[in-house]
């Protein structure tokens, strides 16, 4: 017998394979979005380390940063001139002025100082009196113009200076804040606020 059109069997006549919907239906664009490549002032791409990976952030720092930290340990300081700092931020090699000229990696005390130290050292065979010991101590500790220490007393390196060294004179906010701007360290907050106020007044004056 021939089935009538529109019967109950016709409703169960589903397709066996359902085609995948088009990309345009599934997502907004057919094109894949490329990650924006960061480029420097001359157009070369800047390789940024993976900030989400804590081990890379801890152990794999860029060479420039490592060198800058070494410079700070040696006693070099980033240029205090704001314009010079900006310019050095663009260059590959940071322009740093040496604060501590006497500091060297393999520096030995001068010959005169060594001689004085050797002459003041007392052997065990001699049993000096308290007065003699005091005299020797005073000669050792007395500051003399002829004896200059090879390494002058190191100052405590401030966190600001380390930040400056790590980013060539600029303090970079942490990556978690998603702040791409570089804030110069030298400018205090009060000065910034004054500048903001001046700018507001200027804008208000122009608009009115």
Swiss-Prot record:
Lineage of producing organism: Eukaryota, Fungi, Dikarya, Ascomycota, Taphrinomycotina
A biological-process GO annotation: regulation of cell wall (1->3)-beta-D-glucan biosynthetic process
Organism this protein belongs to: Schizosaccharomyces pombe (strain 972 / ATCC 24843) (Fission yeast)
Annotated region described as Disordered, given as residue ranges: 77-114
Role this protein plays: Has a role in meiosis.
Cited PANTHER family: MEIOTICALLY UP-REGULATED GENE 9 PROTEIN
Keywords, in A-Z order: Meiosis
S-adenosyl-L-methionine is among the record's keywords: no
Domain of life the protein comes from: Eukaryota
Secreted as UniProt keyword: no
Protein name: Meiotically up-regulated gene 9 protein
